[in-house]
């Protein structure tokens, strides 16, 4: 079945008040109430600003809706602690950290924002769908499967797109069109040719007048030709967990296992392997994400070790955030179980920073639990890094066989 990308554009930023509790949203999703004092405008700033679905929090932070480009215009309707509440549609709000935005006192809200013409084309790495926009308006992206589908919501825009210029034969995109679903929601569809999600990104050009939906070309379906990134978790002043029996820090173990994986991949003929760190150095999550964005691997494998306050909890596990990348994590988990480890599970919608990028398939491997005596003994065995590396490599081979 053909894959499908869906892009949803939602019309008109709607605002409420900046009091402790949100007011009832404005009734119109098309015309902004430009005379109301109950909102103010901000623009995103800094590295990797993101919106969250709500005010919840845990050790991984709140549930992320999407990362945003810089300079994106948002309409603040309320404030809660360290977050602003922004209106995306008459019924959908998002939360963003106050430190991720700067006040915009110059821009005036328009009564409506209209999309212009589109153009599709390809270069040597990506298919592009470029939408003419009147402003840097917010968006979010999600993946779907069966059929594969990408959904991107653009908020604050109504269609005035009267032609879509399609230049040449695209490598990944079969067709693209749109439908105005309701006031405040424009849905853009993109049929895909590939059977696997290989990654996408959404960003504005330097003028803010073009929104580029960029679909990554599938690489060669051969392990030797893949560009694989390997991330050794923690490092430097971030020691991670430690075992109760041997006391070895997670940051040391992740580097040992990552090096073993690099060696195994090169032994299998993989020509390009990128390591986020090779020494005991401190790297923040944003630094790793930006490093990987610049490097643009075909896939990312991140190595960690689990821990629990209950020492009977045990097993190996793999994690993903985006459903389109789940197949990679499933086959690797199946191979990891062959090591005699119990299965802790295949965990989805995981809010780990390196599971967040949409530009490339990624898999977080939690080898086993340092807090469990049996798992820790397995982890510390001198042959285990090599065995784990082999199973991960075999999982990659299995995954490539799934691709049509």
Model regions and ranges:
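Solvent-exposed, polar/charged alpha-helical surfaces in well-ordered, non-transmembrane soluble domains
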Residues: 66, 72, 251-259, 263, ...
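Active-site-adjacent substrate-binding region
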Residues: 325-349
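Positively charged n-region of N-terminal signal peptides that target proteins for export
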Residues: 1-4
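Short linear recognition/processing motifs and adjacent strand/loop elements at protein termini
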Residues: 19-229, 249, 253, 263, ...
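Active-site histidine-acidic residue metal-binding/catalytic motifs
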Residues: 210-291, 295-299, 307-308, 325
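Structural recognition of the beta-strand scaffold that forms the well-ordered cores
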Residues: 152, 227-231, 272-276, 299-303, ...
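Bacterial N-terminal signal peptides
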Residues: 6-15
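Active-site-adjacent mobile loop/cap segments within catalytic or ligand-binding domains
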Residues: 295, 300-309, 319-320, 348-404
């Amino acid at each position: 079945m053909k894959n499908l990308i869906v892009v949803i554009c939602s019309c008109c930023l709607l605002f409420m008040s900046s009091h402790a509790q949100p007011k009832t949203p404005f009734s119109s999703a098309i015309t902004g109430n430009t005379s109301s004092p109950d909102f103010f405008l901000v623009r995103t700033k800094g590295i990797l600003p993101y919106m969250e679905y709500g005010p919840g929090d845990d050790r991984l932070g709140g549930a992320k809706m999407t990362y945003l480009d810089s300079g994106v215009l948002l309409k603040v309707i309320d404030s809660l602690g360290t977050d602003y509440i922004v209106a995306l549609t008459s019924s959908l709000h998002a939360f963003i950290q106050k430190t991720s935005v700067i006040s915009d006192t110059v821009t005036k809200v328009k009564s409506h924002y209209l999309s212009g013409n589109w153009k599709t084309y390809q270069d040597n790495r990506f298919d592009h769908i470029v939408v003419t926009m009147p402003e840097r308006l917010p968006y979010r992206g999600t993946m779907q499967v069966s059929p594969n589908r990408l959904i991107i919501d653009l908020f604050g825009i109504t269609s005035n797109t009267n032609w879509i210029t399609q230049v040449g034969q695209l490598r990944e995109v079969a067709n693209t069109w749109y439908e105005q679903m309701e006031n405040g929601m424009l849905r853009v569809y993109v049929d895909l040719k590939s059977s696997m999600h290989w990654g996408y990104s959404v960003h504005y050009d330097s003028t803010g007048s073009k929104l580029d939906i960029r679909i990554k070309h599938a690489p060669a379906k051969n392990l030797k030709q893949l560009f694989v990134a390997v991330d050794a978790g923690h490092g430097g002043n971030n020691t991670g967990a430690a075992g109760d029996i041997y006391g070895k820090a997670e940051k040391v173990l992740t580097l040992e296992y990552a090096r073993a994986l690099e060696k195994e991949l090169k032994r299998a003929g993989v020509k390009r392997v990128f390591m986020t760190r090779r020494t005991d150095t401190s790297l923040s999550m944003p630094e790793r994400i930006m490093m990987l964005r610049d490097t643009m691997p075909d896939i990312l494998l991140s190595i960690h070790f689990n821990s629990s306050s209950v020492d009977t909890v045990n097993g190996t596990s793999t994690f993903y955030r985006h459903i389109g990348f789940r197949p990679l994590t499933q086959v690797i988990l199946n191979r990891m179980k062959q090591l005699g480890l119990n299965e802790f599970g295949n965990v989805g919608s995981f809010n780990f920073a390196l599971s967040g990028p949409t530009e490339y398939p990624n898999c977080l491997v939690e080898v086993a639990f340092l807090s469990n005596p049996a798992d820790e003994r397995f982890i510390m065995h001198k042959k285990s890094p090599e065995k784990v590396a082999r199973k991960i490599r075999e999982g990659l081979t299995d995954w490539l066989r799934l691709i049509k």
